[in-house]
Every structure is written in structure tokens, then in C-alpha cells.
Amino acid sequence: MCKLSYMGQGKYFHLFLIVLLVFGSIGWTQFTEVNINLDMRRLSEGDRQLFNFMEEDIKQYYLNTQFSPDVSDLELIIDIHLVIESVSQGGSQTTVNAQAILVNKEVQYDGSMKTMDQYFYAKGIQFPYSIGRKIIYTSSFDPLSSFLDYYAFMLIAAELDTWNYMMGTSFFNRAVELSDRGKDSGWDQGWDDRWKKARKIKNN
């Protein structure tokens, strides 16, 4: 009987750990819903296969990355419309050129979704890509993950500024610093515009 009781307690303890991990991971990230539309109309059928997992990879990147331990209750909802303009081959490397629109949204009392005040149009997006390539959060510059980080910082900063005056400054600074690294990298396309954008919004 004691053995059965112990086994039952162990079962519930494991269940508790699973629940804690699932809900704990939700609690410490800044984005709670990410909707992605990948537009590949300009690509051939063969090139489209390269992006079979990209929508889900970007979604999971935003949902599971902790962009800051200091702000974990933002519950941001964003829509991303990513247009893949072209895919080119250079040796063993595949280069993707794209543009994107990112907007934040909010659930209304009636359950409908309303587009809020943040609207970012990104052009000159360029990054290397391959099938099965995972998007990993890193402090080093990476053309794809750094692009996603930049707009995460911008969206978080803009949201915090609605809470309190200049509350988002540290995140605008992170966007500026990331843009500096982008400008000095071998994948500098578009980063000068992002640098100017972050500084302009920060100083307004």
C-alpha cells in the first residue's frame, strides 16, 4: 500500500514538473502569440521547398526566446508578413532577399483582434539559409536571428514607452547597437536604415 502511495505521489510530481516547465516557459518570454504569413509567390516551386519550416521556426523563436529577464509580462501579439523576393546561389551558400511588415495586435473585450500602434516595414533583408537551419539566439551577429532580434527590441521598446516615459530606452539602445554590428558585418544590407530608424524613434 505504501509503495502504491509513493508511486502515485511520484506520478503527480512528474505531472507537476511538466506543468511548471510549460507554463514557466510562457511566463518568462515577451511574446505570447506570433502569426506569420510567408509570401513566396515570386519563387519557383523548387525554391519554395527551402522554406518548408521557416514559418514555424520564426514563430517558435519569438515564443521561446527571453529577450530580457527584466520584462516578462508584456504578452505581446504580433503579425509578420514576410515576402521572399529572391533566392540566389553562390558556391555552396544560398542567399535569401526579402522584405517584411511587422505589426502588434491586441485582443479586444469581444475576443476580436485589433491592430495597434506599432507598424514596421523592413526592406533590404538579406541572410544565408539552408533546409533545416535552426534559428538560435546568440550575442554574436547573425543575419537572420539578428534581424528578428532587432524587431523584437523595437516592439518591446515601443510597448514599454506606452507604460512609462522613456521606459523602452534600453531596448532602443539594444536595437541601435545591433544595427551597428549589422553595418560592420558582411551582411550589411538594410542595417543602416534600421540604425537610423531606431535612433529616430528613440530620440522622438
Task: Describe the role of every protein-language-model region.
Residues 30-97, 108-110:
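Start-of-domain marker
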Residues 14-15, 54, 148:
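Alpha-helical structural motif
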Residues 14-24:
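Bacterial N-terminal signal peptides
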Residues 12-13, 48:
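N-terminal, helix-rich and Lys/Arg-enriched segments in bacterial and organellar proteins
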Residues 97-203:
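Acidic/His-rich structured neighborhood in mature extracellular/periplasmic domains
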Residues 1-11:
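N-terminal secretory signal peptides that target proteins for export/translocation
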Residues 25-29:
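Sec/Tat signal peptide C-region and signal peptidase I cleavage site
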